[in-house]
Amino acid sequence: VTCSPVQLSPCLGPINSGAPSPTTCCQKLREQRPCLCGYLKNPSLRQYVNSPNARKLASNCGVPVPQC
């Protein structure tokens, strides 16, 4: 897996608005799952990955948010 937060761009709308997650977002989130700890450690990405909407989105997609 190549860690690239740009791959998660289909998830930006739901993360920002709390809207339902499109299928493409869940697919990308599953692909990028091994990268989530790295994103959580990145100050410019943490606010998105750790937000309540992002956690709800991950839960809806069946992707557990890791404890890093």
Curated annotation (Swiss-Prot):
Top-rank taxon, per record: Eukaryota
Assigned protein family: Belongs to the plant LTP family.
Alphabetized Pfam families for the sequence: Tryp_alpha_amyl
Stored SMART domains: AAI (SM00499)
Protein name: Non-specific lipid-transfer protein 2
Gene Ontology MF: a single term: lipid binding
Keywords: Lipid-binding, Transport
SUPFAM superfamilies cross-referenced by the UniProt entry: Bifunctional inhibitor/lipid-transfer protein/seed storage 2S albumin
Functional summary from the UniProt entry: Plant non-specific lipid-transfer proteins transfer phospholipids as well as galactolipids across membranes. May play a role in wax or cutin deposition in the cell walls of expanding epidermal cells and certain secretory tissues.
InterPro entries: Bifun_inhib/LTP/seed_sf, Bifunc_inhib/LTP/seed_store, nsLTP2
One GO process term, biological-process aspect: lipid transport
